[in-house]
Structure formats: C-alpha cells, structure tokens
Amino acid sequence: YDPETEKFVLIDTCFFTHHLQFADDENDTLWLSGSTEAVGWLNTRLYDETGDERNAQGWCPTVVDTNGDGVITKPWNEPDMSGDFVLTAGDVAIDPALDTRIGSLDKFQRAYGVIPHPDGSVWISRRYPVPGQLIRLELGDNPPETCKSEVYEPPYDPAGDPKAWGYGPRGIDVDRNGLVWTALGGSGHLASFDRSKCNVLNGPTATGQHCEQGWTLHQTPGPRFKGAEGTSANADYHYYNWVDQFNALGLGENVPIATGTTSDALLALLPDTEEWIVLRVPYPLGFYSRGLDGRIDDPGAGWKGRGIWSSFNTGSTQHLEGGKGTASELVRFQIRPDPLAN
C-alpha cells in the first residue's frame, strides 16, 4: 500500500506468507514466514525502483548440514511430508552421509515467526513437532543454491525432568546484541537462545538437542494447571513476543516482552535482574493480546512521546468480556517515570 497514492499493489510470491518483518539493511528487505519448504523475502528497494516482482523476490529451502562438510549439497535427506520424520527430539532416521531438509505440508509444522539477525542471518520459529524448533538460515553468495540452515530445539528430554522442559516456540525476536528471544506458548516460558555458547553447529549430531547450554528458560508468572505441578506447564498462553530494542516503553533498551494472551496482560522481563513487570488490562475490559510493537513519536517529549501498541483480537471476540458485538482493538501502553510525572 502506498499512502501517497492510496493504491494497493498485489505481489505474487512463490512461497507462503504469514508473519513478516523488515530487515535493517540497505534493501529494506521484507522477510516472510509461513513455510519451511521455502522461506522467502522481497527486496522492496528493487521493487520500488523497477516494479519487477519476480526479480525482487528470493527464497531458500531449509536444509541442515548434517554431514558436516560445511556446505549444502544434493541429494539430501528428504522429509516425510507428514512432518514426523525430520529432526525431532530422540532418534533421527537420516543418512549421515547426506544433508537433511526440514519440511512439512502440515500447516502446524510450518515456519511461524521470522526475524532478521544483526549478523545477516534470518531466524524462524517452528511450533511443531514437539518441542518445536528455531531455525537459523544463511543465504550465502548465490541463494537458493548456497542457503544453509541450523536447527535448535528447546531443552526437551522425554525421559528427563519435566520441570526442565521447554516447548512450543511461537514468536521470535532479537535484541541489538544478537540474543534471540522466543515465547514458548506450550511450556509457558520466555526463552533466550545464545548461539555463541554452542560447541556444535553442524554435523550428524546437530539435529536440535545439541546446544542445551545456549538456552535460558524464564518461567512466566501466573497460575499453574491443576495436576501439573511437577512440570514446567504454565496456565498462561504466550501467542507472540517482541524485544523493545530502543526503550519505546520506558523500561530500558533490549527488554523482551511476551504476550500474556490468556491473562489480559503483557509480560516484560528485565534481563539484568530477571524481574517481571506485568502490564495488566483490568477486568472487565478484556485483552486477548496476539502481538505488539513500539513507537517513539517524539524522543524529546519524555514518556508522552513513546509507547507500545498491542493488538486485542481473536477469531471469536463474542466469547470475550463484552459478549456479542465486541470488536478487536489496539491498546497503547505508556509508563510514567513516577506516578506524579506530567
């Protein structure tokens, strides 16, 4: 959509589109998730200059270097398109002499969140199969031929302690230092992942559960499920998350925030102290949050010139507070430096 001309232009793509995120690069690259068969992007600068939608877009398959030779080569191990075969926790039936492609036609096992990384890579989240995955994608010099992926699963040992499990990554974002954050909608954590702590990045053992030391799981506040006291399961549901890189809210830079989707709240984690700040929308207003972003409209106006915005939406708003006729809304949050600040 062009605000100046008030015209919409439809751009055909050869890949699925779902979540979208602009990269901070010279091409204003727009990355789109929706599949693991092909993770795609649009060079918006080139498209604006030429109107050539075919040459302005590109895509990569997600293929992991499981033979450890440092490059991706064909033929590779192809996934069972039901999604049950590839790179799940436990035994992985792959030919170790080949690389391995990740993929599924099951909509719940496709790529979900997407975020460009400061090092030039792109990360996507995959919710299923349990425990879910984060996938790091490098384009190389000549994509799609040079695309290479890495896969990382939250800590999940079916034979181990359920309190240590993490599962269900949905949202994904990154701070200015390159630390990746994801909301684990299944286990109820806001989790960070630091790839620099990994000893193994590729090879036959790099199938997901090979870098537990890179993960830090922060259990979100809130009630537990009855009968689930011995597990990590939280009764809250975290649809997505976001990192406040530029102090738009007022809690500082690089503060990760998860949606408390079923607790009428946003959950901000202060990374230095691991303190939770809960931003609650009071009952009976209702607040089924599914995403958020920040705006600094006037850097010189103090707290009044900045804030974050979150969507209040679901497919069945009639079941929320307000009943039939309840509409989706946008909610703005601002934090005063002290209660009397004007």
Regions found by a protein language model. Name each.
Residues 132-134, 147, 188, 264, ...:
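Repetitive beta-architecture junctions, highlighting loop-to-beta-strand starts
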